[in-house]
Regions:
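Transmembrane beta-strand segments that form the barrel wall of outer-membrane beta-barrel proteins
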Residues: 37-47, 75-86, 97, 134, ...
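Transmembrane beta-strands of outer-membrane beta-barrel proteins
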Residues: 29-37, 74-78, 110, 162-164, ...
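Outer membrane beta-barrel
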Residues: 70-180, 215, 382
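Residues that define the transmembrane beta-barrel architecture of outer-membrane proteins
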Residues: 53-59, 92-97, 145-149, 202-206, ...
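Short loop/turn motifs that connect adjacent beta-strands in outer-membrane beta-barrel proteins
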Residues: 21-32, 66-75, 104-111, 159, ...
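Detector for outer-membrane/organellar transmembrane beta-barrel domains
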Residues: 264-350
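Residue-level signature of outer-membrane beta-barrel architecture
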Residues: 22, 63-69, 102-105, 114, ...
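Outer-membrane beta-barrel "beta-signal"
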Residues: 290, 379, 392-406
Length: 406
């Protein structure tokens, strides 16, 4: 994987140099460069499995280079990302989140390289977001993604926008190692993943999405065919000399997706729904709800938003993920101060199991012009050993992050 990333990086650097040959001085002046450093500390109040600690430190570096031609037709972007973890080597990462060339024409654009594409509208989970692999060891909510190699063609017109994707290489999901937290009791062996496709990670995945805005309604329809971004974890053959491990297996899947957003005054109504078919099973899942924003609460500059969403999965209790019959409620406070302070608090409750809950707190504010301080907290409760949350019931944590931009 590192060799492939370096190959893409070399190709993008060559593209930058080639584009600079005509007028080097003016070309380099058009490059926007941003950098960031992050320090992160996690604390787990409860003891976990053997080898697991309660304090974890990590550091990350990201660079963001962007160039646009004078006629705004050609764009180059490069965003390498490096992460180091104090204890869990599986969290160490060298990734290209962006490394692409893009051409913008009249009513269309094409892109080749590596990028991150987001689909979705709901707060509590993103069912339709299937282009990129999740960087699962980076965040619990699955919102942090790995860069995905792609060839992308977009058409824009009065009938809406059509996005077409060819995805020639698959990124495996990351899992915590023996020393990491937020993992099953058995360690996931990522050295030999299994694939249903005979092409393994080189299977050519395909995706498309049509979207259009109808007055206050935004509508999106999507289709995906390729390697499932979620892994089935299968027990490996028992070896008396080594502890039991889990092996990831990636099935082929076909998925139809629907996402919609309706704006009505202070109300935002949201829906994400999918139908997914694999060799193992077919199922339907959906998340629907609203966010109501009270502007200027208590006569101040603060904006307070109330969030409520229902999560459904037709697999019911057999679903390997939370959210099969759950409700999520939360609030979002935007202080509108010079530091851009925001606070989000949410709780998800399983309606079939009163003892199964999870909750999160996300708060952040700027410190001066070049730093941002963030506080995140998660808790997990479950007494039923068939509940996915049961595996991480002792992994409540507090996380403090400091980002420096330059």
């Amino acid at each position: 994987v590192i060799n492939r990333l370096l190959t893409v990086l070399t190709a993008l650097v060559s593209a930058f140099n080639l584009a600079a040959q005509d007028n080097p001085a003016s070309w380099y002046q058009n490059i926007n460069a941003d950098y960031s450093l992050q320090w992160q500390q996690r604390y787990y109040p409860q003891q976990g499995e053997p080898r697991q600690a309660q304090h974890y430190s990590s550091a990350a570096f990201s660079a963001d280079w962007y160039w646009q031609s004078a006629d705004r037709r050609h764009q180059l972007a490069l965003q390498p990302y490096l992460r180091w973890d104090q204890r869990d080597s599986e969290r160490n990462l060298l990734d290209l989140r962006q490394a692409y060339w893009q051409y913008v024409g009249d009513g269309f654009d094409i892109k080749a390289g590596v990028d991150i594409v987001f689909w979705g509208v709901t707060e509590s989970q993103h069912l339709v977001d299937v282009i990129n692999q999740t960087d699962a060891v980076a965040s619990v909510d699955g919102e942090t993604k790995l860069g995905q190699p792609m060839l992308n063609w977009n058409l824009h017109g009065s009938a809406g926008s059509l996005e077409l994707y060819l995805l020639p290489y698959f990124r495996e999901r990351s899992f915590a190692g023996p020393d990491g937290r937020l993992r099953p009791p058995f360690v996931v062996d990522q050295s030999q993943p299994q694939y249903e496709s005979a092409q393994d990670e080189r299977n050519l995945d395909f995706a498309l999405r049509w979207s259009r805005r109808f007055a206050a309604l935004e509508l999106g329809l999507s289709y995906f065919d390729g390697n499932n971004r979620e892994a089935l974890l299968q027990p490996t053959a028992q070896n008396t000399l080594q502890p039991q491990r889990l092996q990831p297996q990636y099935l082929q899947m076909q998925q139809l997706g629907l996402d919609s957003l309706w704006l009505s005054g202070s109300w935002i109504w949201k829906l994400e729904s999918i139908y997914r078919k694999t060799r193992q099973q077919d199922f339907v899942a959906a998340t629907a709800g609203f966010e109501y924003t009270h502007v200027g609460v208590f006569g101040s500059n603060w904006d307070l938003g109330w969030i409520a969403e229902y999560q459904y999965d037709s697999r019911d209790q057999q679903a390997p993920v939370p959210g099969q019959n759950d409700i999520f409620v939360g609030g979002r406070l935007v202080v509108n101060d010079i530091g851009g302070t925001e606070i989000l608090l949410g709780i998800a409750q399983d309606l079939d199991n009163s003892g199964s809950q999870s909750g999160k707190l996300e708060a952040s504010t700027r410190l001066g012009n070049s730093s941002r301080l963030s506080l995140d907290a998660w808790f997990f409760r479950s007494k039923l050993n068939t509940d996915p949350l049961y595996l991480i019931r002792r992994d409540d944590f507090l996380q403090l992050s400091l980002d420096y931009y330059f």
